[in-house]
Amino acid sequence: MPKKSMEILTESMFYVLMALMKETMCGMEIAGFIEKRTNGRVRIGPATLYTVLGKFLKEEYIRETEVEGRKRTYAITAKGIQAYREETQRLLCCLRDAEEEDRERSIVHE
């Protein structure tokens, strides 16, 4: 069965939703949040950011709350919150699987 386009979020998508879970933000604030939250490990450029925002608007994961000239402010929707929480759970399951695999591997190699 083919997966829905937004079923699994990319790292950039995940962090954009994380930023908007905190508060409404404009694009530059989102990029700044991501860079600060990840200690510079993830830097999202304007092209990627606005592509993600466009997809999220289309899928109704976010909505525009304010438009001042070219500056747009975004807020997460209930659908976006659900997607963020589902992705968080998926990632936690991946981490648990990796930890269990590491434990099993260390037992075998002892």
Q: For each of these PLM feature ranges, what is it?
A:
Residues 1-8, 94, 100-101:
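Intrinsically disordered, low-complexity serine/threonine- and proline-rich regulatory segments
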Residues 85-110:
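Amphipathic alpha-helical dimerization/coiled-coil segments
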Residues 18-19, 82, 93:
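Surface-exposed charged/polar residues within alpha-helices that form helix-capping/stabilizing sites
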Residues 49-56:
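Basic amphipathic alpha-helical segments that dock to polyanions
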Residues 57-69, 75:
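Beta-hairpin "wing" of winged helix-turn-helix
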Residues 6-48:
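N-terminal helix-turn-helix DNA-binding core of bacterial DNA-binding proteins
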